Amino acid sequence: MKRAPAFLSAEEVQDHLRSSSLLIPPLEAALANFSKGPDGGVMQPVRTVVPVAKHRGFLGVMPAYSAAEDALTTKLVTFYEGHSNTAVPSHQASVLLFDPSNGSLLAVMDGNVITAKRTAAVSAIATKLLKPPGSDVLCILGAGVQAYSHYEIFTEQFSFKEVRMWNRTRENAEKFASTVQGDVRVCSSVQEAVTGADVIITVTMATEPILFGEWVKPGAHINAVGASRPDWRELDDELMRQAVLYVDSREAALKESGDVLLSGADIFAELGEVISGAKPAHCEKTTVFKSLGMAVEDLVAAKLVYDSWSSGK
C-alpha cells in the first residue's frame, strides 16, 4: 500500500534546520556540482514564472534533481507585491520532495524557512570566498525575513566589530535591532549605512537602484539578494560595472536579474566555479555576488530536513 506523504509545517522544518550553518558544506558541494554542467549531475532548468497580473503577483516553479544526493524536488513559490503591509507574507513557498526511484511524493514541507536559510547560507559561502581581509563592518539593507536569516548566519560565521542596518521604514529597522542578539546601529540613509562597510547585504523590495558605486568602499563585497525580476534592481550601473561580478547561475542571471541585464555588466564566474577552483576569488577587488536562488539549494535543504525528520520517527 502506498504511503501517504508527510506534511511538515514551518515549525517542524525549523526544528530540523535550526542553524543555517548546517547547510554550508552540502550547499558548497551542490553549487560546485551545478557549475560543472552535466558532469556534476545536477539537472535544473531556469525557474518558470507565471505572472498573475490582476493581483500583482507571480507563481514560480523550481524543479531540480541532484545525482549526488539522489534527490528530486520542486519548489512552488508565490510573490505578491501588494502584501508587504498585510498579515499575508509577500513571499510564500512549499517544497515537494519525491522518491527519485519511482516518482512517489515523500513530503510536502513549508518552503519559507528553507528559502530564508538556504539563501543566507549561500550568501555566507560567497562572503567567505570574496570578502576583503580584515572585514570589520557589516551592513544590511532591508529588514525583512532575509535580513534576519542573513544576520543569524553572518554573526555565526564571521566576527564583525560593527553591524549597521537601514530600512526604508525606520520602525522596522529599529524592531530588527531590538529583536536580534547583539548590537545593531540603525542608520538614517543608505549612504550612511554603507560608507566604509566591508560587507554589504541588500535584501530589499527595491525596483530601482538604492546602492550606488560612489558610496561603496573599494574592495568591499556585496551580496545582492533582492531584485529577482529582469526589470528590478538594487545596484546602480557604476557599481555593477566596476565590481567583479559573481552569480549563482549564469543562465538564470541573464534571464532574471535586472541588476545584470539593465547594467550590461559582465559576469566573471559562477560561485560554484570559485568553490571548485575553476575561477579565482578576487578578494582584493570590489565584488558583487548576485543571488537569485536556485532549485538545487532548496533540494539540499529539503533533503537535510527530511532525513532528520525520518531518523527521528
Curated annotation (Swiss-Prot):
GO biological process: negative regulation of transcription by RNA polymerase II; sensory perception of sound; thyroid hormone metabolic process; thyroid hormone transport
One MF annotation (Gene Ontology) recorded for this entry: transcription corepressor activity
Gene Ontology cellular-component terms listed: cytosol; mitochondrion; nucleus
Coiled coil: none
UniProt: NADPH binding residues: 90-91, 118, 143, 145-146, 167-169, 172, 204-205, 225, 291
Binding residue positions for 3,3',5-triiodo-L-thyronine: 47, 256
Subcellular location: Cytoplasm
UniProt superkingdom: Eukaryota
Tissue and organ expression note: Expressed in the spiral ligament of the cochlea (at protein level).
Annotated Gene3D superfamilies: NAD(P)-binding Rossmann-like Domain, ornithine cyclodeaminase, domain 1
EC annotation from Swiss-Prot or TrEMBL: 1.5.1.25, 1.5.1.1
A Pfam family recorded for this sequence: OCD_Mu_crystall
Chemical reaction(s) catalysed: L-pipecolate + NADP(+) = Delta(1)-piperideine-2-carboxylate + NADPH + H(+); L-pipecolate + NAD(+) = Delta(1)-piperideine-2-carboxylate + NADH + H(+); L-proline + NADP(+) = 1-pyrroline-2-carboxylate + NADPH + H(+); L-proline + NAD(+) = 1-pyrroline-2-carboxylate + NADH + H(+)
Keywords attached to this entry: Cytoplasm, NAD, NADP, Oxidoreductase
Main localization, broad class: cytoplasm
Quaternary context: Homodimer. Binds the thyroid hormone triiodothyronine (T3); T3 binding inhibits enzymatic activity.
Family membership noted in the UniProt record: Belongs to the ornithine cyclodeaminase/mu-crystallin family.
Function summary: Catalyzes the NAD(P)H-dependent reduction of imine double bonds of a number of cyclic ketimine substrates, including sulfur-containing cyclic ketimines. Under physiological conditions, it efficiently catalyzes delta(1)-piperideine-2-carboxylate (P2C) and delta(1)-pyrroline-2-carboxylate (Pyr2C) reduction, suggesting a central role in lysine and glutamate metabolism. Additional substrates are delta(2)-thiazoline-2-carboxylate (T2C), 3,4-dehydrothiomorpholine-3-carboxylate (AECK), and (R)-lanthionine ketimine (LK) that is reduced at very low rate compared to other substrates.
Name of the protein this chain belongs to: Ketimine reductase mu-crystallin
Source organism: Mus musculus (Mouse)
Lineage of origin: Eukaryota, Metazoa, Chordata, Craniata, Vertebrata
This protein's encoding gene: Crym
